[in-house]
């Protein structure tokens, strides 16, 4: 496209004809993003360690027979990641969108955190994101385009008490994503991150109900936590062609927590 040409932007952020691979899709933010993508016309490859949960989510999305499928994957295992990416490509013929939403949080004071918890957090959150980006990114580069959305966190911007492994992993996700954006942007593959505050998924409710959550909300200018669909809305935009000029960005959705 030359500078003289006008860019036509779809303000409905439609994803018709696109195939989206979403990890961590069986529940929480991943499920919300998968559902939002489906409403925008995408076919969904719901990928999760919980194979039954992924298949159940795919079934709930409706649509034409075979429009959505569930796949099992351990994102911390390179062979499992490659097998899942290959299976999705074989089933749908292409992968246009990748969302890395699978993740864990092992919390403890830094001096008490076990090496096992450190290693598992980095393996799932950071290595898992890289491995899936690498496996799917190769296909996107061969196809000449794609959009990747990696879930980071406000913990990728500021230090959070008892979050040493989680912060390390999410700072890493942002770093990896920026490097991929720099390397792949010129070849048609955009890579961005979303960094939410506490999100009121089922796990979020359990972890942050009560006085602890009330205290944290007082530090957020908007005075509340985020809802899964608010994160999904951002993921829809970043995956859509309307975001064609957005590459290497970190979209912070934290009600202003990190500006203070």
Curated annotation (Swiss-Prot):
Enzyme Commission number(s) from the entry: 1.1.1.403
Stored SMART domains: PKS_KR
Pathway: Carbohydrate metabolism; D-threitol degradation
UniProt note: phenotype after gene disruption: Complete loss of the ability to grow on D-threitol.
Keyword Membrane: no
Induction of synthesis: Up-regulated during growth on D-threitol relative to growth on glycerol.
Domain of life: Bacteria
GO MF: carbohydrate binding; erythrulose reductase activity
UniProt keyword list: Carbohydrate metabolism, NAD, Oxidoreductase
Functional summary from the UniProt entry: Catalyzes the NAD-dependent reversible oxidation of D-threitol. Involved in the degradation pathway of D-threitol, that allows M.smegmatis to grow on this compound as the sole carbon source. Does not catalyze the oxidation of xylitol, L-sorbitol, and L-sorbose.
Name of the protein: D-threitol dehydrogenase
Provenance organism: Mycolicibacterium smegmatis (strain ATCC 700084 / mc(2)155) (Mycobacterium smegmatis)
Gene that specifies this protein: dthD
């Amino acid at each position: 496209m030359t500078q003289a040409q006008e860019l036509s932007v779809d303000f409905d952020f439609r994803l018709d004809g696109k195939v989206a691979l979403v990890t961590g899709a069986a529940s929480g933010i991943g499920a919300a993003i998968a559902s939002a993508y489906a409403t925008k016309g995408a076919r969904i490859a719901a990928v999760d360690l919980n194979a039954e949960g992924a298949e159940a989510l795919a079934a709930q999305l409706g649509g034409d027979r075979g429009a959505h499928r569930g796949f099992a994957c351990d994102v911390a295992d390179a062979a499992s990641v490659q097998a899942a990416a290959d299976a999705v490509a074989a089933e749908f013929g292409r992968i246009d969108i990748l969302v890395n939403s699978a993740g864990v949080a092992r919390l403890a004071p830094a001096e008490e955190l076990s090496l096992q918890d450190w290693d598992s957090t980095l393996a799932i959150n950071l290595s898992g994101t890289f491995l899936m980006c690498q496996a799917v990114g190769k296909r996107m580069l061969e196809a000449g385009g794609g959009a990747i959305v990696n879930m980071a966190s406000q913990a990728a911007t500021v230090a959070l008490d008892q979050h040493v492994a989680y912060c390390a992993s999410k700072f890493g996700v942002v770093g990896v994503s920026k490097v991929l954006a720099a390397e792949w942007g010129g070849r048609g593959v955009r890579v961005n991150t979303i960094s939410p505050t506490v999100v009121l998924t089922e796990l979020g409710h359990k972890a942050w109900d009560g006085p602890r959550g009330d205290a944290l909300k007082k530090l957020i200018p908007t005075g509340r936590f985020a809802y899964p669909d608010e994160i999904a809305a951002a993921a829809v935009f970043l995956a859509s062609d309307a975001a064609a000029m957005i590459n290497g960005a970190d979209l912070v959705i934290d009600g202003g927590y990190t500006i203070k």
